[in-house]
Each structure stands twice: as C-alpha cells, then as structure tokens.
A protein has these predicted regions:
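Short amphipathic alpha-helix that is part of the acyltransferase structural core
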Residues: 1-53, 58, 74-76, 80, ...
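Conserved donor-binding loop and adjoining core beta-sheet/short helix segment
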Residues: 10, 17-113, 133-135, 234-266
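Amphipathic coiled-coil/heptad-repeat helices and related helical stalk/stem segments
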Residues: 33, 96, 210, 271-272
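Residue-level signal for alpha-helix termini/capping positions
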Residues: 42, 104, 219-222, 280
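Short, hydrophobic/aromatic alpha-helical segments in well-folded domains
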Residues: 98-99, 213, 217, 274-275
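Active-site/acyl-donor-binding loops of N-acyltransferases
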Residues: 110-173, 220-221, 228, 234, ...
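Oxyanion-binding "anion nests"
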Residues: 206-232
C-alpha cells in the first residue's frame, strides 16, 4: 500500500465527495453536494486542504482555513484546522497523523476547537497546548425543541417520536437589554455592503473579522440554512456585527449565534439581546452559542441560556501560545459553524 498526500486541486472531485459524505453523514443530492463544496472550499478565501490517497481513492482529509487574528494587539495569520478524518480501516497505518504532522510544519500558528473523540485524544499527544475551554450555551424556547436537543445529545440523532411532542412554549417572555444610547440602531447587513469593519474590542486572542467573511456567509447555498447578519450602530458609529445561522429541521427551526464582533465591551450585552430577539422573531425554537468571552457568557446567562459541557480548544506550537485574556473564540472557526442537524 502506497499513500500519497495531494492538494485539493490535484485530486479526483468525485473521490473527495464520496469521502466527505462519509465524514459528514449527510444525504444530499449530487447537485447539492457540488454546490456546497464549491462554496465551502472554492469561495472561502485562504485555506489549504490535504488529501491522503491510496491510488485513485481518497482515504483521508485534513482541511484548514487561514484567517487573520488579533493576538495580544498584533494582527497575525492563523490556520484553523477542520475535517480531520480518515477511513477507519486506514487509521492503523497512521494516515490521519501523517496529514496532521504535514500541516503542523506550515508557518502559521494553528487553532483547533472541538472535534471528534479521536481528535481530542491525539492533539495533546502531539504536544498541542490546551487553551481555556469554550462555554457551550443552549436556550430551548419550546418543549419540542428541548426534546429534540436532548435526544440528539444523548443518542446522536433526533428520534421520530420527538415530532409528537407538543409545541408548548417554555419561555413566555424574554427580557430585552436596554440599548447603550437613545440613538442605538440595528440594521440587516446587506451583501452589497463593502465598508471596512471597525477593529474589535481588545482581546488577547480573537479573529479579525472583515467584509470578505461576511460576503462568504451571505452567499451560502440554501441547503446550509440561512445566515442572519446584523449591524449595530450608536450615534451613527458602527459598533458591531453579529453572525447567526438558522436551520429548518424536521422538528422546527434551530438557530446558532456564530459570532459577535464588538468594538467595545459595553455594547456586547445589548448585541446579544438584540440578536436573540431577531432569531426568535424568525421562528427559532432553540438557540445555541459557543463563547469564551466572559462578557458574552454573562449576557447569555442573563437571557436564560444554560451552560452545557465546555468545548476543548488547542493551539500549535506551544512556543507561540497566546497568554493573558480574555479570549474571544466562538463558532467562527473553520467548520464548527457548519454542523448539520
């Protein structure tokens, strides 16, 4: 057996699709899969995908997004890893490890958030540094949504009996955080907007959001769901952006607050509150959010969100590990925002 490592452009598209269908466990038509992969890999901007091939067959993959981060006040490119997977019958040959070691030799520091049990077992053994864990927040608005989330959490899938659970509202009224000023305003972000985004609050580690990322989300294929992009203003000043995703599932609508980009800490609670109310007005029966920022976590808790098991985060190399705090790590990281179901 001879395993070759090739780039995305040098591999068979049909073989990649077959491998990723097994990785994601999704049941999509060929047309939908082609559209999704063109957006996911072709339109995202900087990134690199390594594929392990046994002859013409794709047997392993490791993908990465490359985007700017603010690290202790300096802007630096960071490589976010995702889609680390190889066919079970090839794991004994170290195919996945070989892909990761190849990626670890690149010049950018690397970030990994969450992942499979296999991933979380291997990264510490590869001497990655563990960052502070990321809180996992959940707010179930209806009884059916709560049943769906529990069955998915415990069994890995949403069971058919969930649809028989009545759509009883568990939360009748949610508090609304007052705006920071009388002239505060929330607007929908238009895909035609090309203005440069303001710098974010001074975190020790946070992604540097730009218009290209917002454009990428705004042009996502319909099968991914719908991304809600909101802009926040105070006295005409652009003070933040929120990115959320709405998915229509069999049991109802699930939403996820993917990321908040705020220019200062004091507007975060208002932005979280307005984003949540927007998602509820759009029909969300449950809202999820990952957050490591203490201000964001406090705002979510005050609105009734419940903390679930935290999500591990890792950094390579140890010698460049960010220190201090706070960190602002959310679902705006590689493919974490694009989980299905």
């Amino acid at each position: 057996m001879s395993i070759n490592v090739v780039s995305l452009n040098d591999s068979d598209p049909a073989g990649i699709r077959e491998l990723l269908v097994r990785r994601w466990k999704c049941d999509w038509s060929e047309e939908h899969l082609v559209d999704y992969l063109a957006w996911r890999y072709g339109a995202r901007g900087s990134g690199e995908t390594l594929l392990a091939c046994d002859g013409p067959r794709c047997v392993g993959i490791l993908d990465s997004f490359i985007r700017p981060y603010w690290i202790a006040g300096r802007r630096e490119m960071v490589r976010e890893t995702c889609d680390w997977f190889c066919l079970p019958e090839y794991r004994a040959f170290g195919v996945g490890l070989h892909l990761m070691r190849r990626m670890m030799a690149r010049q950018e520091p690397m970030l990994s958030i969450g992942g499979t049990e296999f991933t979380l077992d291997l990264l510490p053994r590869l001497k990655w540094a563990q960052l502070p864990r990321i809180d996992n927040f959940v707010l179930a608005i209806s009884l059916r949504a709560a049943a769906a989330l529990i069955s998915t959490r415990l069994l890995g899938q949403c069971l058919a009996p969930v649809h028989a659970v009545p759509e009883v509202r568990l939360i009748r009224k949610l508090a609304r955080q007052p705006p920071p000023s009388a002239d505060a305003e929330v607007r929908a972000y238009a895909p035609s907007d090309q203005e440069e985004l303001p710098n974010g609050a001074p975190y020790a580690l946070a992604p540097s959001l730009d218009a290209a990322v917002l454009q990428w989300f705004a042009h996502a294929p319909a099968l991914v769901g719908e991304f809600a992009l909101l802009s926040f203003f105070c006295a005409g000043e652009h003070v933040g952006i929120s990115i959320s995703r709405l998915e229509k599932l069999r049991w109802g609508c699930k939403a996820r607050i993917i990321h908040l980009h705020a220019t200062r800490f004091e507007v975060i609670a208002w932005m979280v509150s307005e984003t949540l109310h927007h998602l509820l007005e759009r029909g969300a029966g449950a809202v999820l959010c990952h957050a490591s920022c203490p201000k964001m976590g406090s705002a979510l808790s005050e609105l009734g969100f419940v903390r679930g098991p935290p999500i591990p985060a890792y950094w390579w190399p140890r010698s460049k590990q960010p220190t201090g705090g706070p960190f602002h790590l959310t679902s705006l990281q590689a493919d974490n925002a694009l989980l299905f179901g």
